Amino acid sequence: MTGRAGTRPRTPVRRGRDAVPVLVGALVLVLAALPVERTSVPAAEAAVFRVLNGVDVLPFVLVWPVMQLGNVLVVPAAALVAAALRRWRLAVGLLLAGAGTYLAAKGIKDVVVRGRPDGLLTDVVVRGAAAQGRGFLSGHAAVAVTVLTVAWPWLGHRGRIAGVVLAAAVCLARVHVGAHLPLDVAGGAGLGLLVGSLVLLVVGRPR
C-alpha cells in the first residue's frame, strides 16, 4: 500500500518561529555596521581587538586550518558531503546560502567601507599573509555561520555544539591574525545567520 508511513514522501517542515533567526541575524548585522567609520575605530572595539590580536594561544600553523573552515570553498565541499549522504535539501540549501552570502557580502563591502586593522590601528600583529581589500564584513565569519545555520536542523546535539565552537573559532581567529576587527566578524556572523535562516525558510527543515 502506498499510504503506509514508511513509503510517504518526506516533505519539508516550515515553522513560523523559523523567521526569528532571520530577524536576529539582520539585527546583529545592522548593529555591527552602525558604529563603523572609514578612518577610525571605536575605542571599545579597539580595546577588544588589542586583547584578541595580542595574545598568543596557539601557533599560526594551527590557527590557519581553523580559519579555512570559513573559506568559501567549504560551501561546495559541504554540499558534496550532503549529496553523498543523500541529504538533497541540505545540499541545495548550502549552495543557495553560499551564493547568497557571497553576493551579499560583496554588496555590503561597497556600502560599509572600512579598511583592515593594520591600516586603521598601530602596532597590529599580522600573522601570516596580510589580508587585502575592505575589512567590513568578514567573509570567513559569514561563510562559517551560514554553513552552520543551514546544517543546524540536520545536526545532532554534539554536532551542533561542535559547529558553534568551530564557527566561533573562525571568528576569533580572523581577529587574532589581524585580518579583521571585532565588528567585522560580528557583521559577518549576522549576515551568515540572516542568509542561512532565509534559505531554511525556502528549503524547509527535515521531519
Where are the regions that the model predicts?
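Interfacial segments of alpha-helical transmembrane regions
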Residues: 15-25, 78-104
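Membrane-interface elements of multi-pass transporters and channels
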Residues: 55, 85-88, 110-119, 158, ...
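N-terminal transmembrane-helix/juxtamembrane module of multi-pass inner/ER membrane proteins
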Residues: 1-74, 109-128
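Membrane-water interface at transmembrane helix exits
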Residues: 49, 105-109, 113, 152, ...
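Structural signal for the C-terminal ends of transmembrane alpha-helices
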Residues: 2-9, 81-90, 151-156, 198-204
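Membrane-embedded catalytic cores of phosphoryl/pyrophosphoryl-handling enzymes
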Residues: 122-207
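Aromatic-anchored segments of alpha-helical transmembrane domains
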Residues: 30-33, 99-107, 165-179
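Hydrophobic alpha-helical transmembrane segments of integral membrane proteins
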Residues: 96-121, 180-194
